[in-house]
Amino acid sequence: MAAPYSPVMARLGDIVFDAAHPASLARFWAAALDGYAVAPYDEAELARLRANGVADPEDDPSVLVEPAVPGPPRLFFTLVPEPKTVKNRVHLDLRAADPDAEAARLVRLGATQLARLDGWVTLADPEGNEFDVLPVQ
């Protein structure tokens, strides 16, 4: 059970991914995670992009993926100039009723399977960020 909100302690807000191609990586994670979608581009957002010299949302340097319900963290995908070069120091653990079937679905979406261990599967997203798929607890 979660502790009540404390104005003194920090809370997890957003998870931010550095990305070479924020829009395509955002689409991968929106499809990968239950209850998440790429935030829509309304007129105000399109105007913000144009004001920053971005004509096409596909070239947006910072793409938001939102949960369908309040509570879970939002995901931001931010353009960075350098490629990923080493293993993640932090990774996400996804939970699924059937980790092998879920890993196969994620591979069809563009992930790469890195390892199959006892009870879980390690994958990398299309830009090489490692994550695990484990059984539901």
Indicate where each model-derived feature is located:
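Conserved beta-strand in the GNAT
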Residues: P73-T78, D132
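Core segments of cupin and vicinal oxygen chelate
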Residues: P7, D18-G71, E102, R108, ...
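Short, Lys/Arg-enriched N-terminal segments with co-localized hydrophobic residues
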Residues: M1-V8
